């Protein structure tokens, strides 16, 4: 899980979603998991 100020899609499987006001990236590749913080 990467915590970054700006979350970006890395590959075409990445999806940007909002959970409880937190922007997250979910992907089939676990290395692409990110959240904004």
Curated annotation (Swiss-Prot):
Which UniProt keywords are present, listed alphabetically?
Answer: Ribonucleoprotein, Ribosomal protein
One GO term of the cellular component aspect?
Answer: ribonucleoprotein complex
Which InterPro entries does the record associate with it? Ribosomal_bL36, Ribosomal_bL36_sp
UniProt-listed PROSITE patterns = RIBOSOMAL_L36
Query: Which Pfam families does the UniProt record give?
Result: Ribosomal_L36
One Gene Ontology biological process: translation
State the superkingdom. Answer: Bacteria
A Gene Ontology molecular function term of the record: structural constituent of ribosome
The answer on whether this UniProt entry bears the keyword Ribosomal protein reads yes
Family (UniProt): Belongs to the bacterial ribosomal protein bL36 family.
Supply the PANTHER family for this chain. 50S RIBOSOMAL PROTEIN L36, CHLOROPLASTIC, LARGE RIBOSOMAL SUBUNIT PROTEIN BL36C
Task: Supply the name of the protein.
Answer: Large ribosomal subunit protein bL36
């Amino acid at each position: 899980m990467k915590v970054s100020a700006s979350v970006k899609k890395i590959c075409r499987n990445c999806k940007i979603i909002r959970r409880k006001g937190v922007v997250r990236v979910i992907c089939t590749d676990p290395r692409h998991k990110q959240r904004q913080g």
